[in-house]
């Protein structure tokens, strides 16, 4: 049974172990999970995951694996062996890649992390997609990739809250993980397709990834408590 009682995932977007753990020590594992991304993982490797788990946190390993099917599946297997709660892959890697990842987790006898697909990054708008040869709205590409993820048997998707309602309608069994969440009054930063925590949950999101509004707050514990109160 999960120790965390909320849908909040706090992004530990730091370059060093000490900085990440300084924030983690101010947070309550009952009120949030934590996300380890590329910068922190590249700096600290698997040790940071073990340390966070020892502190009671469930860990979302946000490395967005994208490679040939076997290589990606072996990376997902390695993540599972670390004991992470959630791991993600890019849906644009295709059906065979995602299926291979799901199958390697099914072969495990122990706990299995949630396998989540990344659709379109929340920083991308139509002009960004056009730059890589896709002259369509982000939501159209999200729905295309979501259908592939569903077919491959993934547990859920990373998506903008603005796509959550359409995705829940089309794929109600998929769990939706939403970055780009900004509590009312927060700076937008480099996220483009964003909503507040309450708006995101109402739209169909299951988990909310929140970074700078908590990590850069003068009092991160209070900032987290404020978000918990907002969505209560």
Curated annotation (Swiss-Prot):
> Which CDD domains does this entry report, sorted A to Z?
OMP_decarboxylase_like
Q: What class of enzyme is it?
A: lyase
Q: According to its UniProt record, what is one Pfam family this protein matches? A: OMPdecase
GO cellular component terms?
cytosol
Q: What is catalysed by this protein? A: orotidine 5'-phosphate + H(+) = UMP + CO2
Q: Where is the active site?
A: 64
This protein is called what? Orotidine 5'-phosphate decarboxylase
């Amino acid at each position: 049974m999960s120790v965390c009682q909320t849908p909040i995932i706090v992004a530990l977007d730091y370059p060093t172990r000490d900085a990440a753990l300084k924030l983690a020590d101010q947070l309550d594992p009952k009120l949030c999970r934590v996300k380890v991304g590329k910068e922190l993982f590249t700096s600290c490797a698997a040790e940071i995951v073990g340390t966070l788990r020892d502190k009671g946190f469930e860990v979302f390993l946000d490395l967005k694996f994208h490679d040939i099917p076997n290589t990606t599946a072996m990376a997902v297997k390695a993540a599972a062996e670390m004991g992470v709660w959630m791991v993600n892959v890019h849906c644009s890697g295709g059906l065979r890649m995602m299926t291979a990842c799901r199958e390697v987790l099914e072969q495990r006898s122990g706990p299995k992390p949630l396998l989540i697909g990344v659709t379109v990054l929340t920083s991308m708008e139509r002009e960004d997609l056009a730059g890589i040869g896709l002259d369509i709205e982000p939501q159209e590409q999200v729905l295309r990739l979501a259908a592939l993820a569903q077919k491959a048997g993934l547990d859920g998707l990373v998506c903008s809250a603005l796509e959550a309602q359409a995705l829940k309608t089309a794929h109600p069994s998929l769990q939706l993980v939403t970055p780009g969440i900004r509590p009312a009054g927060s700076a937008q930063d480099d996220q483009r397709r964003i909503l507040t925590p309450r708006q995101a949950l109402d739209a169909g999101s299951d988990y909310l990834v929140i970074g700078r509004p908590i990590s850069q707050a003068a009092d991160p514990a209070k900032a987290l408590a404020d978000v918990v109160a907002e969505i209560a």
